[in-house]
């Protein structure tokens, strides 16, 4: 059997048939040309066994990023596993908005619920004069985030904290992509997310609004006079999250921002 025949057979029922190629190429460090050349060769019994195992894991909805052990975020390569969420493209938009609106040197930044460290590491790399701290309730997530910071040569500090419970500083920018999915919304989620990604980073009480409320309650005492808050939100939560923060920050403008698909996806408080 040729490689191309094996790949066609084993990827036929996958939602994204290119996932099999993605995983194999990354596990074996093959570029596109090497992969195409491989397709014309005969597949060995051992290779077929390994390829079948990868296909099986993909058919069980295991995210390809978890199989290869990393994910891309902006220009970063981040280690990921079941301790953290896989970074999403919409979070890149949140980072880009922060960078576009803030160019001043020596700002103090806090990323709440950092997970893999995607937001904090991106900001620390893009603005070397910023002082960036990142917190998470999960010790396991912080361990992985610290590894990612070292891999990507980013200088930042990590703190284990439930939102701002153990934070004492004030910040010029507080950013968060918190858990925001309601427990009764699992029907809208992909099986791969439900089965493999950590519940702690996905779900929140009060129809997904509980962490936003806690951030609003606590950030009042941790924001500088001209400080700003940036948040990622669920696409149905814009008005609810806006109301939570407008109640706490009556002297600031709380705005809803859309992603590239026109869906409510971000909140700014400034």
Swiss-Prot record:
It catalyses: L-glutaminyl-[peptide chain release factor] + S-adenosyl-L-methionine = N(5)-methyl-L-glutaminyl-[peptide chain release factor] + S-adenosyl-L-homocysteine + H(+). It comes from the Bacteria. Pfam families: MTS, PrmC_N. The keyword Zinc does not apply. Keywords: Methyltransferase, S-adenosyl-L-methionine, Transferase. The keyword Zinc does not apply. S-adenosyl-L-methionine binds at residues 113-117, 136, 177. InterPro entries: DNA_methylase_N6_adenine_CS (IPR002052), HemK-like (IPR004556), N5-glutamine_MTase (IPR050320), PrmC_N (IPR040758), RF_methyltr_PrmC (IPR019874), SAM-dependent_MTases_sf (IPR029063), Small_mtfrase_dom (IPR007848). Its EC number is 2.1.1.297. Substrate binds at residues 177-180. GO terms for biological process: methylation. GO terms for molecular function: nucleic acid binding; protein-(glutamine-N5) methyltransferase activity; protein-glutamine N-methyltransferase activity. Methylates the class 1 translation termination release factors RF1/PrfA and RF2/PrfB on the glutamine residue of the universally conserved GGQ motif. Belongs to the protein N5-glutamine methyltransferase family. PrmC subfamily. This is Release factor glutamine methyltransferase. The lineage of its organism: Bacteria, Bacillati, Bacillota, Bacilli, Lactobacillales. The gene is prmC.
